[in-house]
């Protein structure tokens, strides 16, 4: 997977390894959180004289659309919570970063029943639009541009019932305090701005 990240989207070895490791860590942490949520759901909670049992369950079909610049980490940040909570996922990889999906397909086949994780390939406008028009998507999970999110929502026949998980064109300022270590701060700001040629929402 690391080599495929390097070959297809041009990440260097260090950044590709970091993306892979971050993804594995994220999956493990998500599983831990799910177990905690599951345990909490077995107990009644008291609040202001109200005794309640909180149960969380699947929402239905989730359409996951990840970005090309972090095709493993950011896409799995959408996909993994969806399937862990019992949803069915339709997952469309970004147009760049599809080669790494091949070895992962085998893992999905071994780990989940048929139809739980569904992967479609193609251009976003041509693939995602007709899927949204069916009205069978319960959750749109997208990391990308706000114009894409708006146009996809508008295609859904019941967009008032559509749940959204969106990460859209972030801009992140760096606030440097008077007591900051300037050498460390400058290095971190440069790394944050210029890693992967600045093609990242945290630049």
Where in the sequence are the language-model features?
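N-terminal Rossmann-like NAD(P)+-binding subdomain of aldehyde/semialdehyde dehydrogenases
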Residues: 1-50
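Residue-level signal for inorganic ion chemistry
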Residues: 5, 86, 117, 140, ...
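Hydrophobic packing residues within well-ordered alpha-helices of enzyme cores
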Residues: 27, 101-104, 131, 152
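Conserved small-residue-rich beta-alpha loop and adjacent elements
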Residues: 40-115
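A structured beta-alpha segment of the ubiquitous adenosine-cofactor-binding alpha/beta core
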Residues: 51-52, 119-138
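Periplasmic-binding protein-like
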Residues: 80, 138-143
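ALDH superfamily catalytic-core signature
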Residues: 111-112, 139, 147-203
